[in-house]
Amino acid sequence: MKFMNKDLAGETLYTDGNFPVLLGTTAENLKAAAAGENEEYTDMYPSFAKTAREEGFEEIATALESIAIAEKHHEARYLKLLEALENGTTFKRESPVVWKCNNCGFIYEGLEAPERCPACDHPKAHFEVNTFFLG
């Protein structure tokens, strides 16, 4: 966050924390990630913003509230990916769409993402629907 550059320039930050490692199936990982994002936008960042505001740090409070908005969108993205995974539509659609390789930018139009990118040979997992071309 930009305010840290101004307020903490030349300082040293130390952190000590424990972070759980949860390894599961893709569906389990997406559910866990969505739950984490939910906690961040409903509890964690609003609480941080409240404290910052109470301590007179309005700019920081506003930044934290903005981060909470982004976290809500992250949750929605994870849930949409989970839905596509469960419906078998992650790499397959009922009507043609434009697929983009996230490695090299190759564009392909069709019902399914290619098994491998014909330009860079990366696997299907590197493709996503190119939303630039969606209405």
Predicted regions and their residues:
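Non-heme di-metal
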Residues: 1-135
